[in-house]
Amino acid sequence: RKAKTANFGIIYGISVFGLAERMNVDRKEAKELIDGYFETYPSVKAYMEKSIQIAQEKGYVETIFHRKRFLPDINSRNAVVRGYAERNAINAPIQGSAADIIKVAMARIYQRFQTEGIQAKMILQVHDELNFSVPVNEKERVEEIVIEEMEHAYRMHVPLKADCGWGKNWLEAH
């Protein structure tokens, strides 16, 4: 849990103070965590700096499918306003690309269900998760289709991995 908090916080530009508060550690430990993270993953720091630079030059950043997020305040003289835009320059390509990918997966899953006469219904999408209402006799086939389409929605250097959980409600499925 702490690793996830630190990872997402650092990627999205959390301050030493913010990380210390969120993880309930002192500022020294939070600073060491952030410094250690960037030493271990220098390409993350490079990505963050490059994203900000691109936004400053173009006034926007893009997702992997080239949807643009305009950042009119990226060159603001107001540090607070600029900082918000900088965090968005880092975050928007990541979250926007994830949204692009899941939408491709959703469309392909829907098409497969239609083509194969599957009665299961996609009922909810939350971030990188899809929820379905599935007749018992379709469980195995739906799982195969969903995992296949989620994992192959977009080809990347690092393979996408998907899994399925089952239950009578959302809580049980987790």
Tell what function each PLM region has.
Residues 1-174:
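Conserved catalytic core of nucleotide polymerization and phosphodiester-bond processing enzymes
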